[in-house]
Swiss-Prot record:
Gene for this chain: ribA
Classification via InterPro entries: GTP_cyclohydro_II, RibA, RibA-like_sf
Keywords tagged on the record: GTP-binding, Hydrolase, Metal-binding, Nucleotide-binding, Riboflavin biosynthesis, Zinc
The species this protein was found in: Helicobacter pylori (strain Shi470)
Name of the protein: GTP cyclohydrolase-2
Cofactor: Zn(2+)
């Protein structure tokens, strides 16, 4: 592993079943870039994989502004039944960080969409880097996977490391995230 330090594995009992967890720390980051993999003990040669970027507001607080928390819940439920892993990347706010994400949220509250808000505070629509996920896939020896995503950038990034078959991820829209999902589809090319 060129850029990563790897932790021990530990058990993680959840509402969806028993998982294992393992942490990957980017070397030289002083612990600020630690990524988590949540996986079933014995996944197949063609596992179900969810590449999920951290979303504190959606994953932990249940925000209805995005579809992140729902996507993570669906992924964990499916993976517990079908076998596979969630690669949980610490790339809050599509890579802009929590502080900047809250500032972008404030602009969204004023009527700007998610892309406009990011651009107004000096960022691209998506600042994430998925190369770390490729190294994690290599660590587990994954050469073929069923990727649970609607994001074509994730598919393209992981095809550099493994054979990818996309499986769509259906998260219900609500009154708070309907516009956000439309922007993801129309401006970001998500396969919704």
């Amino acid at each position: 592993m060129k850029r990563l330090e790897v932790s021990n594995q530990a058990k993680l009992p959840t509402q969806f079943g028993e998982f294992c967890i393992q942490c990957f720390r980017e070397k030289g980051s002083n612990g600020s870039k630690e990524h988590l993999v949540v996986f079933t003990p014995n996944f197949s040669q063609n596992p179900l994989v969810r590449l999920h970027s951290e979303c504190l507001t959606g994953d932990a607080l249940g925000s209805q502004k995005c579809d992140c928390g729902g996507a993570l819940q669906i992924a964990l439920e499916r993976i517990s039944k079908e076998g596979g892993l969630v690669i949980y990347l610490r790339q809050e706010g599509r890579g802009i960080g929590l502080f900047n994400k809250v500032n972008a949220y404030a602009l969204q509250d004023k009527g700007y969409d998610t892309i406009q808000a990011n651009e107004m505070i000096g960022f691209k629509d998506d600042e994430r880097d998925y190369s770390i996920a490729g190294e994690i896939l290599e660590y587990y020896g994954i050469k073929k996977m069923r990727l649970l995503t609607n994001n074509p950038k994730k598919i393209a990034a992981l095809e550099k490391y493994a054979e990818v078959t996309r499986e769509s991820l259906i998260v219900c829209a609500n009154e708070h995230n309907q516009g956000y999902l439309e922007v993801k589809k129309l401006k970001m090319g998500h396969l919704l």
